[in-house]
Amino acid sequence: MADNKTDKADQIARLVQVAHLYYDENLSQQEIADKLEVSRSLIAQYLQQARDRGIVRIEVINPMNSCENIALEIQERANLERVFIVPGMHKFQDLTMRAIAGAASKYLEQNVSDSDILGMAWGRTITRLVQLLAPSVPRDIDVVPLMGERGYTGTYSQINQIVLQTAQSFNGRPYFLLTPMFVSSVQLKQDLMNDPEVRPAVERWDKLTTAVIGIGAVPPSPGSIAYVGAKLMRMMQERGAVGDICGRHFDDDGNLIENEMNDRMISISLDQIRKIKRVIAVASGVEKTRAVLAAMKTQLFSVLFIDEMLAESMLNKMRKVEK
């Protein structure tokens, strides 16, 4: 019985995936077939099944749809330059994350120019964003990491790999930060940041023109706890932490929470981020509602990419506070 449910869920997930690639990513049926290593006729069948099951609905709608209305309201309430909301796919987190990454990658391609210095954070959505980059022309840019490597070995935490892939996509120059994010002492941090192999990346933090950051929630996902430690995470929660950006934790009012790890952290400061001309933030999942609402109060970013469920949850909270 369980196997039948699993098979059905897998089948629906495949239909959603194919429909997303065809209707949202504008890939042809042949391109999707090549990507998934199946026949074009099977893709056509999947698309028909998606319509028959109600996964895809073709209808004429008002161009100013609900997502656009929500985006504009959040944008105005938070005084942001742009808010982009990826609609639908509530039950398929991976596809939702990919859709956010796809939208953000296109925005980045269109808004990076020659001579820019681009800073990259790490995270699952940012990793997918980098994988989807396909700028039409090369750019003469520098790409630098915004923090050191995490001890956790998940691929989404490998900051220098993210920097390398981004630089290769734009045909730019990567600058690596071959240090851990957390070190054992303040003196070691200072020594490492002054090291000739590290200094070129760190010195560019004050010259960044664009940055891409993720917004972490507190408590974070189980895998993310590994880079901080359960003890420190409990302490941060007790002090009122609700989220983090580049490892720097903040409270509901967007204020930095001081802790002994800050002095031993090799990561760009929030003040440095605040001075960057264009900062693009990405977040997905309704569980990040509180974190993103607090992050907007930090005034660290001007462009935000989120999913529909998260956006609706955020706006409901914002309206309740107003009442």
Model-predicted segments: where are they?
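Short alpha-helical
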Residues: N65, R124, R128, E287-R290
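Structural beta-sheet core signal
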Residues: M120, V143-P145, F176, A281
